């Protein structure tokens, strides 16, 4: 049995499903990739363990982005803009009673988190990024992006087989978790998870939106402490794009790990969690010191 699911209501009336787990000293908003279902996530043991570990040193806030999972579905032909989905992070924080938080974005959740950190600086205590990039499609000045042929083939495959064991095996083998090829337990969970996370039309609409993602221009405007995490052989997001993030976000710290799995909870999750915990605790210490200094000033005044 997973945590209780609640709903945040956005300014335009949409309902966003969210959960709050843990009682740590700092809030941590976890922004999932492409699609999600906050209740189905807890059914995968390794993913549940990863989330539980995050909740052991933070007050973890999970949510399904607008259009996927348990949040309000939208028309596949009129999908919300990237900026609208980014603003939903703030609505979830409001509903969860969070004034400021560390924002942790993975995969597609990365650019959403970057945009939030750049435009909502007072609410962003820190930023953690894993397995992501500021741009997704190939360009002459971004040779690590996916090619037009890749996008066409991917969309065609999704249209034919979204939510089937065949598609789940392909995801595991080609980019999600190559080290878990042959793991039918993972395939069975992923098959059901995809169906509960998004309809075929919604998944396709999201992928088309992802093809247009490019938030490189906002990177210099991110001033929150930032930790960038990446696996050196991630087949979905080459490490060169990860390094570019660390170079362009002022003061960002980069941590690279061996590994070829894109799914953050597969493989060397302990190393990722150790880095994340160290970073969050450093932020907590800084906040505590700032509070102490402010209290001293107020007392002496």
Predicted regions mapped to residue ranges:
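Short beta-strand/loop motif that positions the catalytic acidic residue
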Residues: 222, 228-230
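Conserved alpha/beta-hydrolase "acid-adjacent" motif
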Residues: 235-241
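Conserved HGGG/HGGXW glycine-rich cap/lid loop of the alpha/beta-hydrolase fold
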Residues: 7-72
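Conserved alpha/beta-hydrolase catalytic His-Asp/Glu region
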Residues: 161-209, 218
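Catalytic histidine-centered segment of alpha/beta-hydrolase-like enzymes
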Residues: 257-270
């Amino acid at each position: 049995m997973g945590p209780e699911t609640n709903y945040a209501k956005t300014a335009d009336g949409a309902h966003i499903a969210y959960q709050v787990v843990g009682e740590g000293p700092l809030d941590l908003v976890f922004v999932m990739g492409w699609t999600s279902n906050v209740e189905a996530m807890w059914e995968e043991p390794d993913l549940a363990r990863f989330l539980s570990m995050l909740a052991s040193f933070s007050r973890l806030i999970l949510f399904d982005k607008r259009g996927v999972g348990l949040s309000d579905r939208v028309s596949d032909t009129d999908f919300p803009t990237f900026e609208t989905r980014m603003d939903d992070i703030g609505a979830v924080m409001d509903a969860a009673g969070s004034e400021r938080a560390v924002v942790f974005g993975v995969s597609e959740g990365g650019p959403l988190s970057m945009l939030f950190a750049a435009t909502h600086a007072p609410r962003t205590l820190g930023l953690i990024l894993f397995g992501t990039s500021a741009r997704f499609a190939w360009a002459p000045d971004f040779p690590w992006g996916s090619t037009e042929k890749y996008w066409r083939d991917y969309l065609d495959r999704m249209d034919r087989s979204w939510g089937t064991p065949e598609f789940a095996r392909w995801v595991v083998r080609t980019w999600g978790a190559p080290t878990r090829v042959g793991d039918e337990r993972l395939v069975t969970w992923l098959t059901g998870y995809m169906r509960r996370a998004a309809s075929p039309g919604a998944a396709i609409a999201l992928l088309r939106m992802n093809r247009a993602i490019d938030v490189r221009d906002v990177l210099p405007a991110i001033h929150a402490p930032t930790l960038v995490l990446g696996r050196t052989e991630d087949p979905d997001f080459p490490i060169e794009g990860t390094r570019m993030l660390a170079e362009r976000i002022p003061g960002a710290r980069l941590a690279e790990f061996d590994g070829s799995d894109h799914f953050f909870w597969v493989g060397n999750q302990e190393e990722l969690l150790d880095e994340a915990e160290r970073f969050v605790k450093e932020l907590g210490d800084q906040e505590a010191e700032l509070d102490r200094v402010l209290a001293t000033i107020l007392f002496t005044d």
